[in-house]
Regions:
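Eukaryotic short linear interaction motifs
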Residues: 22-24, 46, 54-56, 96-98
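Glycine-rich, often proline-containing surface loops adjacent to acidic residues and nearby aromatics
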Residues: 42-50
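Short flexible coil/turn linkers enriched for glycine and charged/polar residues
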Residues: 8-10, 41, 81
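Long beta-strand-rich cores associated with HINT superfamily self-processing modules
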Residues: 1-31, 61
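Short histidine-centered catalytic/ligand-binding loop motif
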Residues: 49-65
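Helix-rich interaction surfaces within compact, conserved domain-sized segments
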Residues: 64-129
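Short glycine/proline-enriched loop/turn "hinge" motifs that connect secondary-structure elements
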Residues: 36-42
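Residues in well-ordered beta-strands of folded domains
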Residues: 4-6, 15-17, 38, 48, ...
């Protein structure tokens, strides 16, 4: 089951898969307007932010990026225990699924289009939704 979350900015919808099977479903059925978040180097939920049509990754307010990043960190078994976690994010259209990849595993069409941020401390109000 995919989980939907209300974003602090009403223009956006956040949704998430909690395991590799849900993540695989989201990879297969994403929209071009989706921004994908994941903990770098650790297993985690795939968090998606649905952008309004015509908006790009550069238009997303930093507060919204941090909100999605907190949700991503909170839903990583390893990442939620770490003080500093690197969160990577890119547009769904940049995700590449190659034959032989495990469920939930992705690559990128253009690694330069992958952005990152660091979550230093967990925000329980955001993470415990």
């Amino acid at each position: 089951m995919v989980f939907y979350f209300t974003c602090s900015d009403p223009r956006y919808t956040m949704y998430m898969g909690r395991d590799k099977h849900e993540n695989e479903h989201l990879i297969a059925h994403g929209w071009p307007e989706d921004l994908w978040f994941h903990v770098d180097g650790h297993s985690s939920a795939h968090v998606y932010l649905r952008l309004p049509k015509g908006e790009s990754i550069k238009d997303v307010p930093e507060a919204v990026v941090q909100e999605c990043s907190q949700l991503t960190k909170a839903n990583s078994i390893e990442g939620c225990k770490l003080a500093n976690v690197k969160i990577i994010y890119t547009m769904w259209s940049n995700l590449r699924k190659a034959a032989g990849m495990a469920d939930g595993q992705v690559g990128y069409h253009d690694r330069r289009a992958v952005m990152h941020t660091v979550v230093e401390h967990r925000n329980n109000a955001t993470g415990n939704r």
